[in-house]
Amino acid sequence: MRESVEQRHERILQIVRGHGSMRVTELAAEVGSSLETIRRDVIALAEVGRLRRLHGKVSWPTATLNARDARLARRAPTAESGPLLGMVVPVAGYFYQGVIQGARAAAAAAGTRLLVGITEYSSERFAQQVGNLVRAGADGLLLTPSWEPGGPTGAECEELARLQVPAVLLERRVPVGSLGTQLDRVGSDHAEGAAMAVRHLAGLGHRRIALLLRASHTEPALRLGYAAAMRALELPEDDLRGGGAHPGTGRTEDFEEEFPRLLALIQSGEVRAALVHTDTDAVNLLQRLAAEGIRVPQDFALVSYDDELAAVADVPLTAVAPLKHAVGEAAANQLLLRIADPARQRTHIELLPELKVRDSCGARLASDRGL
């Protein structure tokens, strides 16, 4: 069977990770594809931060740049003449793919470059990537630190406060009163996104709405928004407290431990709607419900938080969709403003997600009407 592009990309990633750094010609020989094909693959993977490329070489994003390559990264010929931006995010796919694309679009529009480092939720790699980008000459940084979901430690806040270049926090918050709160911040209003879903379901007549969440940095805000909306509507909370050990590594079996509780509530007739994060879990829940003979939306209404897979589910899912591209774009623009004027007012920006109504709630509305 012929190897797909995705399979070849995975093989390229495995090879480069094993070597740390290598020439593109060497990579082409090891993969067994033409040099032109591998060059296109490397460009595509570098665009989303999964690889780093420089003057005929390719390296793993977490590999430390030697002094020569760091100088070349700063001095590389380019049509852009603006400041060099650095970006550190946990992963290049899923939520952050759109964020990276938005930041790249803003950088390109401003005539500047964006270098991306990936941490895979490792605090050690986060510190390494920040150092790499600063040594490469980054004039400012877009940062999504690899903190625990509960928030940063005091030491982690101090590290932010000691940064020697302008920085904008991306989809992260420093606790009020802590060091680092003076940094600019751009992110999604996840709490209001959860409340939006609750209001939509309540507007359709639901009075018992379950909440199933996987452990993530988004979880506290989603739980806060859900609880606030349920209280405002004077409805009882049905928070099933799903979760995993760490963002990006939450085990499916931990999340699915809550399914029997949800099933019992459905079968008793008490609960006929749920908000589920992530949309991958919402799609899995849809399949589990179908296996139990529970129809969506006839017997049960389902809203997913996030919109990566929701539209292509067997029953297209109503979803709350964070504006990832817009978040990345706004963060990059904010960083460019900070670099241009270090004394300008500090800004915290939160973008409201969108409610995309499909088939899984039994209603097709143009938008959340504030019910």
List PLM regions with ranges.
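HTH-adjacent hinge/linker in prokaryotic transcriptional regulators
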Residues: 3-7, 21, 43-114
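Flexible loop/hinge segments that line or gate small-molecule binding clefts
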Residues: 146-195, 280, 306-317
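Hydrophobic alpha-helical segments within soluble ligand-binding/sensing domains
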Residues: 174-176, 181-211, 221, 255-263, ...
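Periplasmic-binding protein-like
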Residues: 138-147, 208-213, 267-278, 301-303
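Short, solvent-exposed amphipathic alpha-helices that sit
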Residues: 11, 95-109, 193-196, 217-236, ...
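Short beta-strand elements in bilobed, periplasmic/extracellular small-molecule ligand-binding domains
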Residues: 107-118, 211, 227-258
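An alpha-beta-alpha
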Residues: 195-235, 347-360
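Flexible loop/turn connectors
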Residues: 263-371
